[in-house]
């Protein structure tokens, strides 16, 4: 892609998200969503093949539907309250439709079907943007309207998302689909605590973005897109493979890695609000995600027959300048659990 075009598209994506996050007028928020959606479609189609075109089309149709639902909710709320701005008074029907629209944009169940399909059809770099940056705008609006959200609807969708995120990844061999299902599960954890403690949702989002960015940078570095390529990579660059699998375990929430921190704090927060059944079910469902990450790690490291370096490899490992941030990201993604007592004190 031409550098000028790429820079323009990237600036528009960033601008659209910033407009959504800083606006209090619903029309401006809708414009920001549309700018963001239209700008990212060329990023999804960088490879110019039928699969990426199909992925971009699915993304466009889903996001356009969500935007229409969002405007429908805004119009219903306008007829009842006469307000174009985000206020604490929100019509119940409009609140339900707004929640559905925003969760569709996020990829929560039962509106999650587009996430794995789109992620599988696009390059790793575009998939990174889709699963990290594109979550900021919808989550920021959910954060703003959290006092008016229908709690039962949001908690139900959160629990189903955690379950689907675990079940969906069980039989996957494609790493992009595994990351997509991981994203669905993490979004479920974030939205579960949103109505109780929105700040904790933002902390979870920060940890998720850090871990996912690290994971994708390692996959981009090694050009790995399948579990088989990870197994082959073990023979060529074992250090990078070890780090990749460690980040996977952190994404699954295995103590004492960083990924356990937000899950621990969310379960504690929900329990503090006399909600016992939900965090229990969430913890059980989280074991599904942890299981397929551990199975992948086991299959890659302990069941591969030892081979020599004469094996025909698809790539040659070449360090790149833009990977300078990888070391601090890896440390942050795996070793920040000791900061938990400080965070609990601040809370």
Swiss-Prot record:
GO terms for molecular function: NADH dehydrogenase (ubiquinone) activity. The keyword Mitochondrion applies. It is an enzyme of class 7 (translocase). This is NADH-ubiquinone oxidoreductase chain 2. It is a multi-pass membrane protein. Keywords: Electron transport, Membrane, Mitochondrion, Mitochondrion inner membrane, NAD, Respiratory chain, Translocase, Transmembrane, Transmembrane helix, Transport, Ubiquinone. The keyword Magnesium does not apply. Belongs to the complex I subunit 2 family. It comes from Natalus tumidirostris. Its main location: mitochondrion. Core subunit of the mitochondrial membrane respiratory chain NADH dehydrogenase (Complex I) which catalyzes electron transfer from NADH through the respiratory chain, using ubiquinone as an electron acceptor. Essential for the catalytic activity and assembly of complex I. InterPro entries: Complex_I_Subunit_2 (IPR050175), NADH_DH_su2_C (IPR010933), NADH_UbQ_OxRdtase_chain2 (IPR003917), ND/Mrp_TM (IPR001750). Core subunit of respiratory chain NADH dehydrogenase (Complex I) which is composed of 45 different subunits. Interacts with TMEM242. PANTHER family: NADH-UBIQUINONE OXIDOREDUCTASE CHAIN 2. The lineage of its organism: Eukaryota, Metazoa, Chordata, Craniata, Vertebrata. The gene is MT-ND2.
